[in-house]
From Swiss-Prot:
The modification Phosphothreonine is found at T200. This is Chaperone protein DnaK. Gene3D superfamilies: 1.20.1270.10, 3.30.420.40, Actin, Chain A, domain 4, Substrate Binding Domain Of DNAk, Chain A, domain 1. Belongs to the heat shock protein 70 family. Keywords: ATP-binding, Chaperone, Nucleotide-binding, Phosphoprotein, Stress response. It comes from the Bacteria.
């Protein structure tokens, strides 16, 4: 087997590493750098530039120089975060025919995976130049909180670049691999990996167990924000500088793409300098001009000013830390080491906040720019057999399930479940003689199905005619080692099966994901009341169905007065079943039960007489049938 390279496909910078002589090695690109800017430029003569060459010409070609593409991968054009990027990016973001966020480069529509593939090609070429052989396989990292669509899009990007992606690995987990293999400590250690990169933020709690030289890396929990990173820090500083210039010169730089591109580079440079010094000057001669002549920018920025601008962003990373610890059933005192990953963690304010939260200093012996690529190379070495005695156990970041009766999400796989994993559950039909069901797949933490992320749906038809609750539909969720979901539904009676790999058309933005978990906690009482309401509605629906059936079968065996009272109670219950008042529904249920005594007696007598015929149709061999709300698909032939 050939080399499997490890690639950190970053928002701001990318990096490639290999295993050489049982040790990971970060490779230098053709410019002699160990990291490559994740920037792609399309020149007027049709040339495609990647990395530093693309960055150097960005000032003169801002509309065709693409950066931070990772923020768009697997996302919808109408996403709030994408719309924000539409307004601030110098290049053109458009809506694809299917609603995805794409790019317009010189009139040509391009998908984010297609653009990201250019960076992967550069990483592939870097490895090939060093090794002197063709490379066709890679392990690529993604943020831990990337959803299924974003992972799929990353794999697509690898395929476009001519790489078979052997594994998608979470960035904090990769960093833990790099850290863990480099340490000679024995026994269990629990580490927190705080990963604040150019466009995304992740926190993972990972246990490293070393027994007789064999190391197991088990992810206990993960959390994060897929649209928060260094680019957001840069934007705040850019806006501050542009606003200060406008106050001083009364000129709006926002309308000048060339000026804004220069300002972006200067802001990024100033931010980096302020990690080492307490003040810096942003000097941009001839940034613009008006009828009085050329204008120059000269603004002094202090570290204190920068920290005041970005403090809210840093504070936004604190809540996921609390959730991750809670999900892992740990406290701060259980954390042995804190690892910082991502270039933005070089900011003193970030280090200070993380140190205060965990009550210990972060490790200084892990390179935040290279650790993720090294970990990816280690995983590649494990897959190829070059690295022995390493076992990696990762998790899925959000719960997965389907919509069931009453609009409830029934979870099949809970968040932070170790992957790969597989789980099956038996469901049934909601109507008599229902010939087809629709499986609606959801991702999230809320009880109400509509409050979660819809990943897609598919149909299973050809179900044999039967009373509701009799057919047995086995729904299976299977998450592979890349965290990608495969769903199947099988009619156990006929053996008919339908399966799909979920390929959601849109990514989960940070607001959606964080809201799912936070709202589930903040609105626990609301969710509990909703569950109770659904349960009472389902009870009412079952009672309506069984009472109507009994009326049809033995209604002639009771008095007209009893029959009239039952029909009246049925109408009253039907009139309130859709209301939000649980007590009113419960009251009408009791009223119907009260007037249905004679009908129940007649039905029991009828059942005793026909017991031998009805026993087959009412048996439930598994005893674990869950009513599910499936829509019937009409035959349109």
């Amino acid at each position: 087997m050939g080399k499997i390279i490890g690639i950190d496909l970053g928002t701001t910078n990318s990096c490639v590493a290999i295993i050489e002589g049982n040790k990971p090695r970060v490779l230098e690109n053709s410019e002699g750098d160990r990291t490559t800017p994740s920037i792609i430029a399309y020149t007027q003569d049709g040339e495609i530039l990647v990395g530093q060459p693309a960055k150097r010409q960005s000032v003169t070609n801002p509309k065709n120089t693409l950066f931070a593409i990772k923020r768009l991968i697997g996302r919808r054009f109408q996403d709030t975060e994408v719309q924000r990027d539409v307004n601030i990016m110098p290049y053109k973001i458009i809506s694809a025919d299917n609603g995805d966020a794409w790019l317009d480069v010189k009139g040509q529509k391009m998908a984010p995976p297609q653009v990201s593939a250019e960076i992967l090609k550069k990483m592939k070429k870097t490895a090939e130049d060093y090794l002197g052989e063709q490379i066709s396989e890679a392990v690529i990292t993604v943020p831990a909180y990337f959803n299924d669509a974003q992972r799929q899009a990353t794999k697509d990007s690898g395929r476009i670049a001519g790489l078979e992606v052997k594994r998608i690995i979470n960035e904090p987990t990769a960093a833990a691999l790099a850290y863990g293999l480099d340490k000679e400590t024995r026994g269990n250690r629990t580490i927190a990996v705080y990963d604040l990169g150019g466009g995304t933020f992740d926190i993972s709690i990972i246990e490293i167990d070393d027994v007789d030289g064999e190391k197991t890396f088990e992810v206990l929990s993960t959390n994060g924000d897929t649209h928060l990173g260094g680019e957001d820090f840069d934007s705040l500083l850019i806006n501050y500088l542009a606003d200060e210039f406008k106050k001083d010169q009364r000129i709006n730089l926002y309308n000048d793409p060339l000026a804004m591109q220069r300002l972006k580079e200067a802001a990024e440079k100033a931010k980096i300098e302020l990690s080492a010094s307490h003040q810096t000057d942003v000097n941009l001669p001839y940034i613009t001009a008006d009828n009085t002549g050329p204008k120059h920018m000269n603004i002094r920025v202090t570290r204190a000013k920068l920290e005041s601008l970005v403090e809210d962003l840093v504070n936004r990373t604190m809540e996921p830390l609390k959730v991750a610890l809670k999900d892992a059933n740990l406290s701060v005192s259980n954390i042995n080491d804190v690892i910082l990953v991502g270039g933005q963690t070089r900011m003193p304010l970030v280090q200070k906040k993380v140190s205060e939260f965990f009550r210990k200093e972060p490790r200084r012996d892990v390179n935040p720019d290279e650790a993720v690529a090294i970990g990816a190379a280690v995983q590649g070495g494990v897959l190829s057999g070059d690295v022995k005695d390493v076992l990696l156990l990762d998790v899925t970041p959000l719960s997965l399930g389907i919509e069931t009766m009453g609009g409830v999400m029934t979870s099949l796989i809970a968040k932070n479940t170790t992957i790969p994993t597989k789980h099956s559950q038996i469901f049934s039909t909601a109507e008599d003689n229902q010939s087809a069901v629709t499986i609606h797949v959801l991702q999230g933490e809320r009880k109400r199905a509509s409050d979660n992320k819809s990943l897609g749906q598919f149909n299973l038809d050809g179900i044999a005619a039967a009373m509701r609750g009799i057919p047995q539909i086995e729904v299976t969720f299977d998450i592979d080692a890349d965290g990608i979901l495969h769903v199947s539904a099988k009619d156990k009676n006929s053996g008919r099966e339908q399966k799909i790999t979920i390929k959601a058309s849109s990514g989960l933005n940070e607001e959606e994901i964080n809201k799912m978990v936070q709202e589930a906690e903040a609105n626990a009482e609301s969710d509990r009341k909703f569950e109770e309401l659904v349960q009472i509605r389902n009870q009412a629906d079952h009672l309506l169905h069984s009472t109507k059936k009994q009326l049809t079968e033995v209604g002639d065996n009771i008095s007209l007065d009893d029959k009239s009272a039952i029909e009246g109670a049925l109408k009253e219950l039907e009139s309130v079943i859709k209301k939000e008042d649980k007590n009113e529904i419960e009251s009408k249920i009791q009223s119907l039960i009260k007037v249905s005594g004679k009908l129940l007696e007649a039905s029991q007598k009828h059942q005793e007489q026909s017991k031998s015929q009805s026993s087959n149709s009412t048996s439930d061999p598994n005893g674990e049938v869950v009513d599910a709300e499936f829509e019937e698909i009409k035959n349109k032939k």
